[in-house]
Amino acid sequence: MGGISIWQLLIVAVIVVLLFGTKKLGSIGSDLGASIKGFKKAMSDDDAKQDKTSQDADFTAKSIADKQGEAKKEDAKSQDKEQV
């Protein structure tokens, strides 16, 4: 009563084929499949890239600000040594 029967689905499918044609439906299906494949590939590439960067090196990454801070500390130490 409330559900869609197999016959109603077949009638809808026949109407869709008559409206769009088999060539158009085939191209839509292949385009949809290609886009899904590209999406899955992009998702797996992101995961692989993230794993590679997180396990790439044994040392901790330092930012430019950290390097500049260390350089200032070394300059201050060398100036202190010169003053003594």
UniProtKB/Swiss-Prot annotation:
GO terms under cellular component: TAT protein transport complex
GO molecular-function terms, A-Z: protein transmembrane transporter activity
Alphabetical list of HAMAP family matching this protein: TatA_E (MF_00236)
Protein name: Sec-independent protein translocase protein TatA
Region (Disordered): 42-84
UniProt keywords, alphabetically: Cell inner membrane, Cell membrane, Membrane, Protein transport, Translocation, Transmembrane, Transmembrane helix, Transport
Origin species: Salmonella typhimurium (strain LT2 / SGSC1412 / ATCC 700720)
Gene Ontology process terms (BP): protein transport by the Tat complex
Major location (coarse): membrane
Pfam families to which the protein is assigned, alphabetical: TatA_B_E
Function: Part of the twin-arginine translocation (Tat) system that transports large folded proteins containing a characteristic twin-arginine motif in their signal peptide across membranes. TatA could form the protein-conducting channel of the Tat system.
InterPro entries tied to this protein: TatA/B/E, TatA/E
Family the UniProt entry places it in: Belongs to the TatA/E family.
Localization: Cell inner membrane
Membrane topology: Single-pass membrane protein
Subunit structure: The Tat system comprises two distinct complexes: a TatABC complex, containing multiple copies of TatA, TatB and TatC subunits, and a separate TatA complex, containing only TatA subunits. Substrates initially bind to the TatABC complex, which probably triggers association of the separate TatA complex to form the active translocon.
Regions crossing the membrane: 1-21
Biased composition range(s): Basic and acidic residues: 42-55, 64-84
